[in-house]
């Protein structure tokens, strides 16, 4: 299992429509960067905005045998943060497990489709349908809160470093702050 941790754009951006979204995502030069941009620009805008949008995801499986439909199954999360003093405080975010379809056009990649697992009583049947042979692997990682928290910690530490932020702590709503 490869764990992918990615940092998104500085601001949460409201979703764009149709081909505009694809043109923005075409700026990504590899499919992981395309996923980061998609999560930051299309998914993060579904939540209350923060100063920073930070995608965190675990790759479950990849099929990159066809550059016109690279398929990445994963447990995709988006967190929106605002900085207060030395602490990044989570203002919103959520989980979006599913299957990303990424297309290569020339040297650029963009997300062409995202099949998301449904909520509520449809979660299990839709997860089984979308993840198929990778369902058990998905379940193991999706159910491991400690693994996700460790991954999120590492992603946030890299995000703070890469963006020159002064934060030394992060805090999820209702929980004590944790050191980066």
List each model region and its residues.
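Soluble non-cytosolic domains of exported or imported proteins
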Residues: 25-29, 89-92, 146
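N-terminal export/targeting and maturation segments
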Residues: 10-77
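Mature extracytoplasmic domains of secretory-pathway proteins
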Residues: 56-121
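Low-complexity, intrinsically disordered terminal/linker segments enriched in charged
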Residues: 112-180
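C-terminal motif of bacterial Sec signal peptides marking the signal peptidase cleavage site
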Residues: 3-6
């Amino acid at each position: 299992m490869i764990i992918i941790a990615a940092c998104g754009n500085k601001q949460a951006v409201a979703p764009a429509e149709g081909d505009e979204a694809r043109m923005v995502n075409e700026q990504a030069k590899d499919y992981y960067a395309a996923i980061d941009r998609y999560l930051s620009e299309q998914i993060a805008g579904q939540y209350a905005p923060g100063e920073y949008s930070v995608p965190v995801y675990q790759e479950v499986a990849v099929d990159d045998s066809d550059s016109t439909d690279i398929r990445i199954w994963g447990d995709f999360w988006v967190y929106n943060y605002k900085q207060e003093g030395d602490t990044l405080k989570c203002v919103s975010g959520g989980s979006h497990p599913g299957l990303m379809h990424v297309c290569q056009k020339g040297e650029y990649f963009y997300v062409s489709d995202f099949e998301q697992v449904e909520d509520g009583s449809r979660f299990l049947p839709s997860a089984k349908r979308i993840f198929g042979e990778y369902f058990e692997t998905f379940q193991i990682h999706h159910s491991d809160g400690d693994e996700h928290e460790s991954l999120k910690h590492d992603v946030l530490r890299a995000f703070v470093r890469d963006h020159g932020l002064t934060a030394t702590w992060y805090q999820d709503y209702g929980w004590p702050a944790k050191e980066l």
